[in-house]
């Protein structure tokens, strides 16, 4: 998925983790010129450099998936693109395809995502109101080995978007008592 696509690009560079993290940060900040500068300092295959160079163009509707498939530097990246096509076909069944945009430069900022990463936006805000993704190893840190997918609703962004859209939310007050047996 998006993260598999970009991870395959990173793996193809054979760079150290420190350089990969620097590139990941530059991509997250949409500084693709900085990415090119770093890549130019290392011996990296032209196909991989070209794939990184094309990343800013790999944002949009389903038409970008064909481009991504053409520049994919390896089998893992091609499989990720094919899986995104399959997910898009499922979303079409639910009639939401007009609300889907792909961004193959997304890699997540927490480092635990292992599959698809997604964000949800609404009118009146440029920031995501929902962020989530798949993480196969996160729950191992809590004693349970199981793949998972989850999301967070960013309440500040959601409330800001509702306010900008002039949607009033009735609020009430409730008393809440939380008890835990600290044994």
Spans of model-derived segments:
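Short terminal or interdomain "cap/linker" segment that borders an active site or interface and mediates
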Residues: 3-36
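Positively charged, Gly/Ser-enriched RNA/tRNA-binding surfaces
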Residues: 5, 9, 34-183
